């Protein structure tokens, strides 16, 4: 008999789709991905991964997002 394990997210697991939405919100409509990536010091491809929820931003990037937006890291990660 095959044993099935149910995978649950721990409270510390980031919700990448929500983080992605908030990063897009921080970038806004005034900046292209390329422009915003340059401000953050990353490639446009990496910013795209963050904005699509395919990658979790590093602490360094979270700090840069905080500095750029004036939003807390808690807000970027949780929306609160």
Task: Show the residue positions of the predicted features.
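A short, Lys/Arg-rich alpha-helix, primarily the initiator
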Residues: 1-29
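Short basic helix-loop element that most often maps to the first helix and adjoining turn
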Residues: 20-39, 64
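Residue at a beta-strand N-cap/secondary-structure junction
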Residues: 30, 56-59
């Amino acid at each position: 008999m095959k044993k099935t394990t149910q995978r649950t997210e721990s409270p510390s697991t980031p919700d990448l789709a929500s983080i992605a939405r908030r990063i897009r919100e921080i970038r806004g409509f005034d900046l292209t991905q390329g422009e915003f990536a340059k401000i953050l010091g990353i490639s446009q491809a990496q910013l795209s991964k963050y904005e699509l929820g395919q990658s979790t931003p590093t602490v360094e990037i979270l700090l840069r997002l905080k500095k750029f937006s004036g939003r807390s890291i808690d807000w970027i990660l949780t929306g609160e």
